[in-house]
């Protein structure tokens, strides 16, 4: 531990060196880095996460990486290099899964130094019904991002964006409709009791792809503005 000029303890040398290395890597690299960190209990959210990853990978100038919460918890420092982190998990009993909560609590070590401050953030979730109180899960992930000082990005997509005529049907948007669940906070999917890969349906998967692409595009704009 070094001491600052005022005699008070300063940051550990190792912490300063790590931050310097990250700063230099940002100066000399030409790719913005996006991480998708997810937990999936039965495989539905895994398909959603992979779709978010595909969407982010479509953006030129983006290096997209995907990690489970277990993998990310084992190597939290890896996320320090990210320009954006997109969090995803299933909704269980109206809340985020225990595995995602465990990751969030492990990542509290980054909160003390605000290491993830000003990184872009996003979130997605899946449940077994149209509602399932999924919004509560997304809000929990949003609050986690705010605790870290991150900048959160929503879907920016109208319900049934590619099939507006579906909004005039009492049955609501079809399985092919983008944002058929109508979420502005983050990407949602409804799998009911259908096993993967039949669920999530095409519209939910394409919504996740579009969301990953949107977050990546905003991340690229943000990193260029900071350069």
Spans of model-derived segments:
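Helix-loop-strand module that forms the ligand-binding subsite of alpha/beta enzymes
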Residues: 70-170
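Intrinsically disordered, low-complexity segments enriched in small/polar residues
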Residues: 5-8, 41, 59, 170, ...
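Short flexible/disordered coil segments
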Residues: 124-136, 184-197, 219-227
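Mobile beta-alpha loop/short-helix "lid" or hinge segments that flank ligand
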Residues: 151-195
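Glycine-centered flexibility motif
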Residues: 10, 55, 98, 133, ...
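N-terminal beta1-alpha1-beta2 submodule of the flavodoxin-like/Rossmannoid cofactor-binding fold
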Residues: 16, 26-116, 175-178, 194-227
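N-terminal amphipathic/basic-hydrophobic helices that include classical n-h-c signal peptides
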Residues: 1-30
């Amino acid at each position: 531990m070094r001491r600052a000029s005022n005699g008070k303890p300063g940051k550990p040398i190792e912490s300063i060196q790590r931050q310097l290395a990250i700063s230099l890597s940002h100066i000399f690299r030409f790719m913005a880095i996006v991480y998708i960190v997810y937990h999936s209990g039965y495989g539905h959210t895994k398909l959603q996460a992979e779709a978010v990853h595909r969407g982010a990978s479509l953006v030129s100038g983006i290096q997209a990486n995907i990690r489970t919460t277990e993998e990310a918890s084992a190597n939290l420092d890896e996320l320090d290099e990210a320009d954006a982190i997109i969090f995803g998990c299933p909704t269980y009993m109206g809340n985020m899964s225990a595995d995602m909560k465990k990751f969030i609590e492990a990542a509290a070590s980054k909160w003390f130094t605000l290491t993830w401050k000003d990184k872009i953030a996003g979130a997605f979730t899946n449940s077994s019904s149209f509602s399932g109180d999924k919004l509560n899960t997304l809000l929990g992930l949003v609050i986690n991002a705010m605790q870290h000082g991150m900048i959160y990005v929503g879907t920016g997509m109208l319900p049934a964006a590619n099939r507006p005529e579906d909004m005039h049907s009492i049955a609501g948007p079809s399985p092919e409709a983008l944002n058929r669940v109508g979420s502005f906070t983050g990407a949602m999917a409804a799998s009911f009791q259908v096993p993967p890969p039949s669920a999530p349906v095409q519209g939910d998967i394409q919504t996740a792809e579009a969301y990953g692409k949107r977050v990546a595009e905003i991340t690229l704009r943000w990193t260029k503005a900071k350069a």
